[in-house]
Curated annotation (Swiss-Prot):
One Pfam family of this chain: Lipase_3
Any single Gene Ontology cellular-component annotation: extracellular region
UniProt function note: Toxin secreted by the type VI (T6SS) secretion system that acts on prokaryotic as well as eukaryotic target cells.
Highest taxon, organism lineage: Bacteria
Quaternary structure (record): Interacts with VgrG3; this interaction allows TseL secretion to target cells.
Protein name, per record: Toxin TseL
Gene: tseL
Compartments in which it is found: Secreted
GO biological process: lipid metabolic process
Disruption phenotype: Deletion does not abolish killing activity. However, triple mutant lacking tseL, vasX, and vgrG3 fails to kill Escherichia coli.
Keyword line: Secreted, Virulence
UniProt main location, coarse: secreted
Classification via InterPro entries: AB_hydrolase_fold, Fungal_lipase-type, Sec_MonoDiacylglyc_Lipase
Length: 641
């Protein structure tokens, strides 16, 4: 029966039924295969496909009918339409109340529904069965469809079939939105599938991997990433593109990570160094620590149940992985040299992941990680590049140590990698360029006759010029006073991974003089994530030029204040000499002068770098800060605020 060739008003004695299917934003939903069934005579059915969101059935029997829609058309068509903005009044309900039915007599009947009110058979997807089950109070478990009466126009607003996913901008250019998103995803790698963190004690699960993925699928906003409360930037997607996750944990080495995926992309997150130095296993007894004599003849303090320390995630990371800086040349990386500890950690995780990686080989790959996790993410990216040659492979790391030598960096220079450093984070400074803990490299029998210092230096340093180097394009957050930072993107730092003839010698903008000035306090994701979010907030409303100029002005004021403080302390020091001031107090004044002078030097370095940047058009974009070459979209600005 063609609904457009039937006239209700032309046939007032005949019964009819009109149905409209609308999205939450009052858009007509076409392509739905709708069937109405007479409740008194179930063999009496009619079927039409929605056009302009409508079907009209004429010449039908009076009585109760039930409308159902093919499950396939529901799942295919409804997910195409976006959700209504939160708090907005339903435009469907408003319009239905103002319009007359097909007979031009009564107002239309409005109903808010879900796909579960109409599907002719329930999908196998248990999530859909639970989250989109029917809400019709007259629904029947035995019979599919929505209960209706003849001679009515029903307007059905169908709940959007949508999910969330973190905002990922599809670009090879640096953008701060991606930096923030993958910082959260790197933090998520510290969670387990079921708990906020992997310490064997935590029972909280707001930031567990399964919790976050389930919330995104339900189109709910997660409020945690791991054990850190955080604001996720999200975009709405069709339900068929909702993310799923697989968690991996290898017990012997302690490697952990995940693959989050849909039909288009795969995100690999690798856990960094665990900050937990107690075993996840329950203690067997209360045995105390005791002193024993080691085979080497050196005294050691250990516990009877030594596994309480060595079996902890943090100790495994520290001893088995982080401190093993020997350079090895595995065949997987074409004979180039990598850090042995990081290699072993990565291969242990890969032994679990590998069977699933092949399922995603034609998708876009994104890899991320913090600290040790960044090292693992880089090595996995290299293996993915060699094995699958994916169309897109992008890597985001935070506080990542050096992973491979020059030969490794040269081989994998085409992997797009944005490497983030917070202030003077210590971890990116290690292993030092010259380090190699393979004690046999370059070792000669006559070396045993050298001094202990020389022998130790030879055993712990590299013996050739294929030294540790950083991979990736540097972005650095720099604090210029107690409350403010500036972001140096790869365009501003210009610390390239490889500039053809010369490998960059700097691994971060030189605002500190050495490792003694670097800080482990600035290493945690609880530092990186808020700092990146503050940059997003600031740069969503002003240009990078204005942001830098404000920083320069603040630095000039702070330098002037520090210089005045220095002169005041210096005058006090001069007056203290020879007037009987205790030596300890004089020493304190000298120490204070030294500290102030170091602050002045640091602030001058940052100011000088910023002045160079703002005077160079090649390093300073003219627009407000960007996702690629565009300003932030309004929907992202709203979430940031």
């Amino acid at each position: 029966m063609d609904s457009f060739n039937y006239c209700v008003q032309c046939n007032p004695e005949e019964n009819w039924l009109e149905l409209e299917f609308r999205s939450e934003n009052d858009e007509p939903i076409d392509g739905l295969l709708v069937t109405i069934t007479n409740q008194s005579a179930p063999s009496n059915t009619y079927t039409q496909t929605t056009s302009s969101g409508k079907v009209l059935f004429g010449k039908i029997a009076a009585g109760e009918w039930r409308a159902s829609v093919s499950q396939a058309s529901l799942l295919t068509e409804v997910e195409k339409y976006a959700s209504r903005k939160e708090g907005q009044e339903s435009p469907v309900k408003k319009r239905a109340a103002a319009e007359l039915d097909a007979a031009d007599k009564d107002t239309k009947q409005y109903r808010f529904t879900t796909i579960g009110d109409f599907w002719d058979e329930a999908p196998k997807d248990e999530f859909l069965q639970k989250q989109h089950k029917g809400i019709d109070v007259n629904a029947s478990a035995e019979k599919a469809g929505f209960r209706l009466s003849h001679n009515q126009t029903y307007v059905f607003e169908i709940k959007a079939l949508r999910s969330y996913m973190p905002v990922i901008i599809d670009t090879d250019e640096f953008n701060l939105v991606n930096s923030y998103t993958f910082a959260l995803l790197s933090k998520l790698a510290y969670a387990t599938n079921d708990f906020n963190r992997d310490d064997g004690k935590t029972i909280d699960n707001q930031g567990a991997i399964s919790t976050v993925i389930s919330q995104l699928k339900r189109k709910e906003r997660p409020t945690y990433s791991g054990d850190l409360q955080a604001k996720w930037l999200l975009e709405e997607i069709p339900y068929s593109k909702a993310l799923s996750a697989q968690y991996y944990a290898e017990d012997d080495v302690g490697s952990e990570g995940y693959i989050i995926f849909n039909d288009e992309l795969a995100i690999i997150g690798v856990r960094g160094t665990e900050p937990y130095f107690q075993s996840k296993k329950p203690p067997v007894d209360n045995t105390k620590f005791k002193i024993i004599k080691a085979a080497s003849g050196m005294a050691a303090v250990i516990a009877d149940k030594i596994e309480s320390a060595t079996d902890s995630p943090g100790m495994k990371d520290l001893i088995i992985t982080d401190l093993d800086a020997a350079q090895i040349a595995p065949e997987e990386f074409g004979g180039t040299y990598v850090h042995r500890g990081f290699y072993q950690y990565t291969m242990a995780l890969l032994s679990l992941m590998e069977k699933d990686l092949g399922l995603h080989k034609i998708k876009k790959f994104y890899c991320c990680g913090h600290s040790l996790g960044g090292a693992g993410a880089l090595l996995i990216s290299a293996l993915i590049k060699d094995s699958y040659h994916p169309p897109v492979l992008r890597l985001y790391t935070y506080g990542m140590p050096r992973v491979g030598t020059r030969s490794f960096v040269e081989r994998y220079q085409n992997i797009l990698h944005y490497r983030h450093v917070n202030n003077h984070d210590l971890v990116p400074q290690i292993p030092t360029v010259w380090m190699n803990t393979d004690v046999s490299e370059g070792f000669h029998v006559l070396d045993v006759f050298k001094s202990r210092v020389d022998l130790m230096r030879k055993m712990l340093t590299d013996d050739d010029d294929d030294n540790y180097q950083h991979h990736g394009h540097l972005s650095q957050l720099l604090t210029y006073n107690s409350n403010n930072q500036v972001l140096l993107t790869p365009k501003q730092t210009q610390v390239t991974m490889l500039d053809l003839a010369n490998l960059a010698t700097n691994d971060s903008v030189a605002m500190v003089d050495g490792l003694s000035d670097a800080s482990i306090v600035e290493h945690g994701m609880e530092q990186y994530i808020p700092n990146l979010f503050e940059q997003l907030t600031a740069l969503s409303d002003e240009s990078l030029m204005v942001h830098y100029q404000r920083a320069i002005s603040a630095l000039e004021q702070e330098i002037a204040t520090l210089q005045q403080s220095y002169l005041t302390v210096k005058q006090a020091w001069i007056e203290s000499i020879g007037n009987g001031t205790p030596t300890m107090n004089i020493g304190r004044l000298m120490s204070e002068m030294h500290s102030i002078n170091k602050l002045i030097e640091n602030r001058n370095k940052i100011r000088g770098e910023l002045r160079q940047i703002v005077s160079d058009p090649q390093r300073m974009p003219a627009t407000k800060f960007l996702i690629s070459q565009q300003t932030l979209p309004d929907e992202i600005k709203v979430q940031i605020r």
